[in-house]
């Protein structure tokens, strides 16, 4: 019994040491770890300084105007322009824009508005990640050097049959081969399924672990694999703060 207690204490001690190591890694990978859902200027002020990459949800309104909101039927009256001003003041930082409602009718107005903002605030196109479910409408952005990504909209692999999973992989191969986007972006639970795919395609990966805080990425074996994967360019994490919406 005494030997079992000693082994238990040693294991517990090692777990504490490992957890502390992960905790102290927070902030050590600004090149890869970004802030998920920074949809208010208050959150940008509170948390933006801790991340070199922020993610913002955007809905396109009339004349290509970009409204910072997660849902198309909701508005907080927050224009995207202050975020470009923030990027102008923080050279080297990047912004990931999850565009919720890109379509045939607004794609050109969106491109013109985006390009105008980049010119006004002197922001290189490469500093923006433009993400949409409409990968087929992204070529115009891609050829003008915006970093574009297709939002992979699929259930968890664990909820799919093998045939359904293979169908998703095949569909994404067509996207990767199209040249319309530079990356595929997907929830973290798709990483192990997709990490070995499309190696003959010129395509990169982005992901989000929106239920995990930053230190959990360093703690979890899959998170460590993500950090070491050169094809995976960004991982968004949860950091709600006081002004999350």
Protein language model annotation of sequence segments:
Residues 2-245:
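Phosphate-group recognition and catalysis centered on beta-loop-alpha active-site segments
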């Amino acid at each position: 019994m005494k030997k079992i207690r000693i082994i238990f204490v040693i294991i517990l001690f090692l777990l504490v040491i490992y957890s502390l190591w992960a905790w102290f890694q927070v902030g050590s990978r600004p090149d890869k770890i970004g802030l998920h859902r920074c949809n208010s200027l208050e959150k940008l002020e509170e948390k933006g300084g801790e991340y070199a990459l922020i993610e913002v949800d955007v809905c396109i309104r009339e004349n290509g105007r970009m409204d910072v909101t997660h849902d198309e039927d909701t508005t907080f009256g927050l224009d995207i322009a202050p975020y470009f001003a923030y990027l102008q003041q923080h050279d080297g930082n990047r912004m990931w824009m999850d565009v919720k409602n890109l379509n045939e009718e607004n794609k050109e107005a969106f491109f013109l508005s985006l390009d105008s903002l980049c010119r006004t605030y002197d922001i290189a196109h490469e500093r923006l990640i433009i993400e949409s479910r409409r990968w087929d409408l992204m070529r115009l952005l891609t050829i003008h050097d915006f970093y574009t990504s297709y939002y992979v909209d699929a259930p968890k692999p664990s909820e799919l049959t093998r045939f359904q999973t293979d169908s998703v992989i095949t569909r994404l191969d067509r996207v990767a081969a199209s040249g319309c986007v530079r990356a595929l972006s997907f929830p973290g639970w798709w990483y192990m399924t997709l990490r070995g795919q499309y190696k003959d395609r010129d395509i990169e990966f982005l992901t989000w672990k929106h239920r995990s805080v930053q230190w959990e990425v360093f703690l979890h074996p899959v998170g460590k694999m993500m950090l070491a994967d050169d094809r995976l360019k960004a991982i968004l994490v949860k950091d709600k703060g006081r002004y999350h919406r």
